[in-house]
Amino acid sequence: MAKQVRKTGKKKEKKNIPEGIAHIQSTFNNTIITITDPIGNVIAWSSSGMQGFKGSRKSTPFAAQMAAEDCVKKAKEHGLRKVQVYVKGPGSGRESALRSLQAAGLTISLIRDVTPIPHNGCRPPKRRRV
């Protein structure tokens, strides 16, 4: 009979972090929410694809809401109560992710839009003809 092999990997530490930063990156295809401590070390993260949404359903506001709720649930295990929110990107999940962060019981102290704006950088993709 085979012996059970114990994992010798790193165990997740329970940190006590009352204040953090929530980064919401909302693209046309997906929404990624990352919660970090004030220095920038990742506490919890989640995305629409991680919640089981595939293809075009990943870019919906509902998928972003589910991802934000999951991320807050993970972050609250580390004692998170107050966040600053940095929103990046043009996607449809921006507002709903922000609302669900607030509805999940986190205090939002700051909302900042950090979407990168090119000073005439790369050529944009061609217009869609549908």
Curated annotation (Swiss-Prot):
PROSITE patterns: RIBOSOMAL_S11. One of its GO terms (cellular component) is ribosome. Pfam families: Ribosomal_S11. GO terms for molecular function: rRNA binding; structural constituent of ribosome. The keyword Hydrolase does not apply. One of its GO terms (biological process) is translation. InterPro entries: Ribosomal_uS11, Ribosomal_uS11_bac-type, Ribosomal_uS11_CS, Ribosomal_uS11_sf. It comes from the Bacteria. Keywords: Ribonucleoprotein, Ribosomal protein, RNA-binding, rRNA-binding. PANTHER family: 40S RIBOSOMAL PROTEIN S14/30S RIBOSOMAL PROTEIN S11. Part of the 30S ribosomal subunit. Interacts with proteins S7 and S18. Binds to IF-3. Belongs to the universal ribosomal protein uS11 family. HAMAP family: Ribosomal_uS11. Located on the platform of the 30S subunit, it bridges several disparate RNA helices of the 16S rRNA. Forms part of the Shine-Dalgarno cleft in the 70S ribosome. This is Small ribosomal subunit protein uS11. The gene is rpsK.
